[in-house]
UniProtKB/Swiss-Prot annotation:
This is Undecaprenyl-diphosphatase. It is an enzyme of class 3 (hydrolase). Belongs to the UppP family. It comes from the Bacteria. One of its GO terms (molecular function) is undecaprenyl-diphosphatase activity. PANTHER family: UNDECAPRENYL-DIPHOSPHATASE. Keywords: Antibiotic resistance, Cell inner membrane, Cell membrane, Cell shape, Cell wall biogenesis/degradation, Hydrolase, Membrane, Peptidoglycan synthesis, Transmembrane, Transmembrane helix. Its EC number is 3.6.1.27. Bacitracin is thought to be involved in the inhibition of peptidoglycan synthesis by sequestering undecaprenyl diphosphate, thereby reducing the pool of lipid carrier available. It comes from Gluconacetobacter diazotrophicus (strain ATCC 49037 / DSM 5601 / CCUG 37298 / CIP 103539 / LMG 7603 / PAl5). The chain crosses the membrane at residues 12-34, 49-69, 93-113, 120-140, 159-179, 234-254, 263-283. It is found in: Cell inner membrane.
C-alpha cells in the first residue's frame, strides 16, 4: 500500500474513532495517534497528505453536533430576536457570550503553542502516557465530587464569564495528545457548579465553534496539498461515518449524563487508564 494513501477500511476505522472519541471523554487525538501505531499502519494521520480526510471528518462531526443541538441553537437565536431588554433575549446574549469567552483561551494558546506541543509530544508513546493521565484526572474528579452534595445546577446561563474563561483554559489541556477535550471541559464545568448533564451540554456546545474553526483552517491549508487519486471519495465516506457515529455518541452521552450524576466519568476514567497503560507497554516492545 502507498503510505501516502488510506484504504477504505482504514478510513472507516479512523472515522468511527473520530465520531466517538471526539465526544466521549477519552481523547480523539490520542486514539488517532495510538491506534494506527498499534495496528502497524504506515501512514501519518496528521500528515499534510491527509488534510482532506481530516477536514471531512471534522465537517461530519460538526454537522452531527449541529443536528443534535439544533433546538438549543434555535432557542438561542430566537431569543436574540426577542424584545429589547426581555429576559429571554438577555439570557440568549449571555449564553452566546459565554461560548465566545470559553473559546478565546483555545484560540490564543492554540495559536501560540499547538504545533509546538504536538511536535514535542506527538508520538504514540506520549499519547499513551497522556491517555493514562486523562483517566486519572477523570477518576480524581469523580472522587472529589463524591465528597460534595449532589449538584442540582443544570442551567448554563447560571455561569459567569469568569467561569467560562476557566472552562476554556481547561479545554487547552486537549492540545496534549491523549487528554480529552470533552473530558477536560466537562471537568471544568463540574468544578464551576454545573451537574454532569449541564457540563456535558456546555462542553458539546463549546465544541461546535472549535471544530468548525479547525475545519475552516484545515480547508484553507488543503488548497496547497496535492490530493492522491481516490482519496477525496474515501474522505467523503469517512465524513458520513463520522457524522453517524458522532450523532449516536452524542445522543447516548446526553442520555447517560441525564441518568447518572454520581461517578458518571469513572467508567471512561478506568478505560483510559487501562488503554493508556496497555498501549504504552505494547508500543514499548
Amino acid at each position: 500500500m502507498d503510505s501516502r494513501t488510506m484504504t477504505l477500511i482504514q478510513a472507516i476505522v479512523i472515522a468511527i474513532l473520530q465520531g466517538a472519541t471526539e465526544l466521549f471523554p477519552v481523547s480523539s487525538l490520542g486514539h488517532a495517534v495510538i491506534v494506527p501505531a498499534l495496528l502497524g499502519w504506515a501512514f501519518d494521520p496528521h500528515g499534510e497528505i491527509f488534510l482532506p480526510f481530516l477536514v471531512m471528518l471534522h465537517l461530519g462531526t460538526a454537522i452531527a453536533l449541529l443536528v443534535y443541538f439544533r433546538n438549543d441553537w434555535a432557542a438561542i437565536f430566537q431569543g436574540l430576536r426577542g424584545r429589547d431588554g426581555s429576559q429571554r433575549q438577555a439570557e440568549s446574549i449571555h449564553i452566546l457570550a459565554l461560548l465566545v469567552v470559553a473559546t478565546i483561551p483555545a484560540v490564543i494558546i492554540g495559536g501560540l503553542l499547538e504545533h509546538w506541543l504536538r511536535a514535542l509530544f506527538g508520538t504514540a508513546r506520549y499519547a499513551a502516557i497522556f491517555l493514562f493521565l486523562n483517566g486519572l484526572l477523570l477518576l480524581l474528579t469523580e472522587r472529589m465530587k463524591s465528597r460534595q452534595p449532589v449538584q442540582g445546577g443544570y442551567a448554563i446561563a447560571s455561569l459567569t464569564y469568569a467561569d467560562a474563561a476557566i472552562i476554556g483554559l481547561w479545554q487547552c489541556l486537549a492540545f496534549l495528545p491523549g487528554i480529552s477535550r470533552s473530558g477536560a471541559t466537562i471537568i471544568g464545568a463540574l468544578f464551576r457548579g454545573l451537574n454532569h448533564e449541564g457540563a456535558a451540554r456546555f462542553s458539546f456546545l463549546m465544541a461546535q465553534p472549535v471544530i468548525i474553526a479547525a475545519t475552516v483552517r484545515e480547508a484553507l491549508h488543503m488548497r496547497h496539498v496535492a490530493i492522491p487519486p481516490g482519496q477525496m471519495q474515501v474522505a467523503t465516506i469517512g465524513a458520513m461515518v463520522a457524522a453517524v457515529t458522532a450523532l449516536a455518541s452524542t445522543a447516548f452521552l446526553m442520555r447517560y449524563f441525564h441518568n447518572h450524576e454520581r461517578w458518571a466519568l469513572s467508567p471512561f476514567g478506568y478505560y483510559c487508564v487501562l488503554a493508556g497503560a496497555v498501549s504504552f507497554f505494547i508500543l514499548g516492545h
